Amino acid sequence: MKIKLAFAVLLALCLSLSVMPVLAEQAATRADLARYYDDVTSLQGRFTQQTHDESGRILEESSGEFWIERPDRFRWNYAEPWPQEIVSDGERLWVYDQDLDQVTVRSLADSLGRGPATLLGGTLGELEEAFELTFPEPGRVALQPREATLDYEHVLLRLEDGVPVELELEDGLGQITVLRLEALERDVEIDPGRFEFQPPEGADVIEAGGGRTL
């Protein structure tokens, strides 16, 4: 009986010791994530984006530049293959499709968590409100939407040196979009005009949830 008890205690100790490094790694990744949202005031760089289906076939590739400034101000300029601008002034979100000469505008609060721009440009509180966070590997954060109304079913964020470098988003059709960030500069001064948007003259402007104005 004593031998069995000693073995059980030893096994429990071994299991607890094996779990401790994992918990430490999870805590470190969570701390890195919190520092990004709490301490990094701005981030800018270039990006590439690739979408492929569940079989791995590439459906779309794009690239461009981005600027993020807290709280909730950002601009993503897609240069290829179809020019597009996604701009937030902290209150409203503008999406301008140049080839369609069309602008869609909505409240930023209604858009949080719906795409890379709002995921990376928001706050940690907004992120935790929209997603359940887990930490499957060092430097990786898995985000599970709390509501089925969001555009993606699974999101995986990869951190490197305390900032996001890759975002993987899977939708309900099994399509996966991978966004990679490069040439990153953090805590730099960004021209406030980057986060302003004026619809081009003659563009079709659509108020999401409302009517259409010309």
From Swiss-Prot:
Residues 1-24 form the signal peptide. It is found in: Periplasm. InterPro entries: LolA/LolB/LppX (IPR029046), OM_lipoprot_carrier_LolA-like (IPR004564), OM_lipoprot_carrier_LolA_Pbac (IPR018323). GO terms for biological process: lipoprotein localization to outer membrane; lipoprotein transport. Keywords: Chaperone, Periplasm, Protein transport, Signal, Transport. One of its GO terms (cellular component) is periplasmic space. It comes from the Bacteria. Gene3D superfamilies: Lipoprotein localisation LolA/LolB/LppX. Its main location: periplasm. Belongs to the LolA family. Monomer. This is Outer-membrane lipoprotein carrier protein. It comes from Alkalilimnicola ehrlichii (strain ATCC BAA-1101 / DSM 17681 / MLHE-1). The gene is lolA.
